[in-house]
């Protein structure tokens, strides 16, 4: 079954979760999402795979960009939130491990093992 990993090599949690997968023989396709941001369509699929209905659940709400862009406004439609994630990939929570049709955010890193 294909596996994909949205990875930020500068993030300790991302490195730790990847090491857990590799220790179990899993070599996922790595996506450097900061350099290659997912499209709006890909983000929609990712939200479904994560079982999320609110794009804010995928956002790093502590990032300065979150407030600067007004993403804390509860009146914003989901489409606007997803577009913001595509345009500002630093806002995407990480790491994300995709195994088949399911995905999980690796926080704590051990969560990635739930899909194996």
Summary of predicted features, one role per range:
Residues 1-20, 28-33:
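Local sequence-structure signature of Cys/Sec-based thiol-disulfide redox active-site neighborhoods
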Residues 24:
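Conserved dinucleotide-binding and phosphotransfer motif residues
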Residues 33-116:
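Thiol/selenol-based redox catalytic cores and closely related redox-interacting motifs
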């Amino acid at each position: 079954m294909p596996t994909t990993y949205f990875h930020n090599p500068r993030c300790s949690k991302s490195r730790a979760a990847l090491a857990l997968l590799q220790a179990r023989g899993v070599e996922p396709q790595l996506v450097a999402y900061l350099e290659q941001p997912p499209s709006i369509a890909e983000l929609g699929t990712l939200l479904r795979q994560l079982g999320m209905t609110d794009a804010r659940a995928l956002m790093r709400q502590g990032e300065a960009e979150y407030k600067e862009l007004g993403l804390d406004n509860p009146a914003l439609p989901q489409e606007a939130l997803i577009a913001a994630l595509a345009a500002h990939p630093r806002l995407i929570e990480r790491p994300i491990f995709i195994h088949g049709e399911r995905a999980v955010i690796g926080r704590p890193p051990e969560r990635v093992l739930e899909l194996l």
